[in-house]
Amino acid sequence: MSVDLVNNPPHYSAFGFESLELLEKVFNLMPLKNMIFYIGNALKYSIRSKFKGNEIQDLKKCEFYIKRCSKLISEDFKIFESKEIMCYLTKISEKDFKLFLLINDIIHFALNPSQRNYNAVVNHIKKYIRERI
C-alpha cells in the first residue's frame, strides 16, 4: 500500500486527525481574519515538526509566521474557547504534552490576538526550540 503524500501525508495526521480539521476550526473562530495565513502556517509547521524530518527548521518557520502577526495585534477581542478545538488538543497532548502546550499557545493567540499573548507565544516557541538544539 502506497502513501498518498499529496492528499493525506502522514506527517499531517500523526496525532490521529487530519491537521486541516483543527486549522479550519481555529480559522472559523479567529477574530482577525487577516492573520489566518500566518496562524495556519505556524500551526502547520508546529504540528508536523516531529514527523517531517527537520524539527528545528519547522519550529523556526513556526516562529517566523507568528512574528508576522505582530503588526496585526489588537487588544479589543473577547476570549474564545471551543470544545471542538479541545478535542484535537487532547489528542496532541496524549502523544506529546510539550508540543501540545506550544500549539495551545498558538491557538490561544490566534483567538485572542493581544500583545501579551503574542509575547507569550514567541517566548514559548524560542524556549521550545532551545530545548531541542
What are these regions, as identified by a protein language model?
Residues M1-I133:
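Intrinsically disordered, low-complexity regulatory regions
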